[in-house]
Design a protein with these regions (language model features):
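Catalytic core of pol beta-like nucleotidyltransferases
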Residues: 1-19, 27-29, 33, 46-134
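Short hydrophobic/aromatic beta-strand micro-patches
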Residues: 40-44
Length: 134
């Protein structure tokens, strides 16, 4: 069974998971035998303690299932830059709640767009200061 199918069958129909994305080397075809598996999971829960417990629970189980080192990221608390990479280069393998995923994406894209503006402003300011010799 391929790693994509294995991940999909493992996480499908899990009530506490909204969506699962594969990202990193396995998503862009650069994986090697020693590569780890990077998964981003959307739980749709704002309680960091509960999300961390679920990450721990699923990390052990999916690592055993895949027989690979696996890294899990909670999309619920991921930064804008990481979310941008997950949405841009990741592969969505599981959607258990399409409405919650659509809402999360709408909110995340809004934050990513705002963050991009402020990051650009900050970078322009830094470059200007360097050019001025400060």
């Amino acid at each position: 069974m391929s790693i994509h199918k294995n991940i999909k069958s493992f996480f499908e129909n899990k009530k506490d998971i909204v969506a699962v994305y594969l990202f990193g080397s396995y998503a862009d075809g650069r994986e090697r035998a020693s590569s780890d598996v990077d998964l981003a999971i959307l739980f749709g829960n704002r309680d960091r303690g509960i999300v961390n417990q679920m990450l721990d629970k699923y990390l052990v189980a999916i690592s055993r299932n895949l027989r690979k080192d696996t890294h899990l990221t909670a999309m619920d608390f991921a930064g804008e830059e990481l979310l941008k990479q997950i949405f841009k280069k990741g592969i969505c393998l599981v959607v258990n709640d399409s409405k919650k995923l659509a809402y999360f994406k709408m909110m995340a894209f809004s934050k990513i767009a705002s963050f991009h503006y402020y990051r650009s402003q900050m970078q322009s300011g830094v470059v200007r200061k360097v050019m001025e010799g400060r």
